[in-house]
Amino acid sequence: ADAQSQMNNQSFSRILIPRFTTFRNISSDDKTYTQIVETISKDEARNRLIIDDVHKAIVEGRTPIVLTSLTSHVRELAEMILPYAKHVITLIGADSIKEKRIAMERLRNIPPTDSLAIVATGKYIGEGFDYPRLDTLFLALPISWKGNIAQYAGRLHRNFEGKKEVRIYDYVDIRVPLCDTMYRKRLKGYASVGYGTISTNGKTDFLKKELIFDSNTYKVAFYQDLIGIKQSLVISCQRIKYKYPPRLISQLRDLLHNGIEIAVHIKEQGYNEKDLADAGIDVIYRNDLSIQCAIIDKSILWYGNINLLGYNAEDSNVMRLCDPSIATELIDIIYEDNSKQILYNSSKNLV
């Protein structure tokens, strides 16, 4: 069903909560997806972050389902949740028909007032799985296909007495380029099913909520943030490339003249860097940069796959977050590599 029409007929809101992890590869970044997932699933700090969030949800009276792609991860997370819920049910696609039947019978017989957590593989809760009590989804391992997002989120969208808000917790491993890219792709999936998007009834205040915008809707909110800027702006993008200079160039020039610190980081050079140099703005090149974002006053973060200084596809998305800790983490990532070099700055061209 169309997300907006479905939401109009439901009493609960849909909330996306991104959780940025500290996980990073110790060895080479050139690992396959399978290798990365295997390593991530065994990371103690990351698993503890997930379990702490699940625990809080249970304390709030919520009914969580934790999704992962590995059977071993299901077992480990379920074991960690046991102290916090009266019932912890595991659902694994590889289980026998008998095991699946027993698990579903257990679910059907759990009183709605008893605390419950489900830990499952994504394949298990595809089409056909129905448990209306669920109101909180924890995406414990990265995926990118938006069809999976719609399918998984759909498990939360069944009407149930007392359901006022459904949440999805997404664990984003921003220090792993492949995982960072996959999360940016997931934003499109979340937007398509009504998570973190602007309300059509006009009631949403985009300066207070964390929202997902597309290439046609982000500019009003982004420029309002720039008007309120007090100290600094860091932009990270793939390249500075356009046919006509965007409004942002003149806006950056005005901010610079008002004493705002500005730095633009790029992955590819050889396009329109000189326009920013002429405006007096530092441009810093780093050939392994993967993150696309804008960080305002080290607290407001615009993060996604929209290039603020270049071309964008119609279905590009960006998410606005107000979180100083995440903003600081991204600044550390952007500045951490010694291979960066300043191409242009306010006093001279091509350093």
Description of each model-found segment:
Residues 1-14, 190:
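Post-DEXD/H (motif II) to motif III coupling segment of the RecA-like Helicase ATP-binding lobe
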Residues 14-36, 81-85:
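Short, basic/glycine-rich phosphate-binding loops at helix/coil junctions
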Residues 28, 35, 160-204:
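C-terminal helicase lobe
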Residues 28-69, 76-80:
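Conserved interdomain hinge at the start of the Helicase C-terminal
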Residues 75-76, 86-125:
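Conserved helicase ATPase core of P-loop NTP-dependent helicases/translocases
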Residues 118-119, 127-142, 151, 167-170, ...:
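A short beta-strand element within the Helicase C-terminal
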Residues 203-351:
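PLD/PLD-like phosphodiesterase catalytic module centered on the HKD motif
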